[in-house]
Amino acid sequence: MLIQPSIALFEPDIPQNAGAIMRLCACLDLPLHVIEPCGFLLDDRKLRRAGMDYLAGVSMSRHVDWQAFEDSTPAHRRILASAHAEVLLPDFDFAPGDIIVMGRESAGAPDYVHQACQHRVRLPLVSGQRSINVAQAASIFAFEACRQLHWFSHLGDETRDDSIE
């Protein structure tokens, strides 16, 4: 049985990034956890614009805070995407049901989130570069997890819309 990875947004700041990640989750059939408080309303116009008409297809769980998120996901490994991690994404092995935790755009993740996550993983970047956009990073992490877990075979070709060129 395939159990897809999921993405968690820790107190997201920027609605456009959250909307782009929601669209990613809709397109890959990945659950999304939003850990509040957010720096915007979840019905924000900018969020809807970035997510377009894909938002209705997102399986989203909202959590009032980190503790509520932890309480609702006790059986899952939490993998923190962090620019400060020692383990590189290409060297990390994902497991079914892993939750990829993305920190705030403005401040990353606080120490208690680092400590609560079983693994911390970073993207390999050119020396001297700090990080990339959180939506881009979420996409890279999600695609690598899906690739490793053979999740793409679940999606099948019927998901393609050949009318779009």
Label the predicted regions.
Residues 1-165:
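Post-transcriptional modification and biogenesis factors for structured RNAs
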